[in-house]
Each structure stands twice: as structure tokens, then as C-alpha cells.
Regions:
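Conserved C-terminal structural/oligomerization subdomain of aldehyde/semialdehyde dehydrogenase
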Residues: 1-119
């Protein structure tokens, strides 16, 4: 249906009847958007399976937050229109290069630590 294929932001509840988790995952993953999904279950195996298999930026299990994760780099996947992946601390790693420099002011030649020598 059309409501399955739209990325709706607002007070809208869509109820889609499915026969099992496999079908629910197919419906979820069959849309071109992937901001977030919610799952309500007491089955911890199903919860972790959902977090692994659902094709979206964030998976809520039993609604643990209010949905304002601006500090995280999830931003959604596929053609979702909300946010960027450059959120959270990971942005520093993405846009950074690490360099190392060693300075010796002793004025003497230093031998490698692996050298075995007698002086």
C-alpha cells in the first residue's frame, strides 16, 4: 500500500498485518527509506535479530527513548530524508587523519630498541 512506501513525519500510526517476523522484516526492508523502526517484544533473540536484519539507521526495541538521537551518527539509510551520518563523535574520525612525530633533542644517535649491542 502507499502508506508502506511513504516516509511520514507526524502523528500517524500505520498498522500492517503480517503473519510472522520474517514477513514484517520483508515489509520493513522493502521500502526505499530507512530512518528507524520500532519493535515491541519480550523475545530477546527476536530483538537482536531485528537490530541485525532490519535495514534502517536505528532500531527501537520496546521504545527505550523518545526518538531524539541527534548525538548519534545514524541518520538513516537508503533514501531517508532526515539527518546526516556526520553526527556524534564518529565525525572526528571520518574527517581526520592521525599523524605521529618523534623528536629527539639529545644530540646523540639513538639505536633501535631491537639492537643487541654491548657498549
Amino acid at each position: 500500500s502507499r502508506i508502506e512506501q511513504e516516509e511520514i513525519f507526524g502523528p500517524v500510526l500505520s498498522v500492517i498485518r503480517v503473519k510472522d517476523a520474517d514477513e514484517a522484516f520483508r515489509v520493513n526492508n522493502g521500502v526505499k527509506y530507512g530512518l528507524s523502526s520500532s519493535l515491541y517484544t519480550q523475545d530477546v533473540n527476536l530483538a537482536f535479530r531485528a537490530m541485525q536484519e532490519l535495514d534502517n539507521g536505528i532500531t527501537y526495541v520496546n521504545a527505550p527513548t523518545i526518538g531524539a538521537e541527534a548525538h548519534l551518527p545514524f541518520g538513516g539509510v537508503k533514501q531517508t530524508g532526515n539527518g546526516h551520518r556526520e553526527g556524534g563523535w564518529e565525525v572526528y574520525e571520518f574527517y581526520s587523519e592521525t599523524k605521529v612525530g618523534y623528536v629527539d633533542y639529545s644530540g646523540t644517535l639513538q639505536r633501535a630498541q631491537i639492537d643487541n649491542y654491548d657498549d
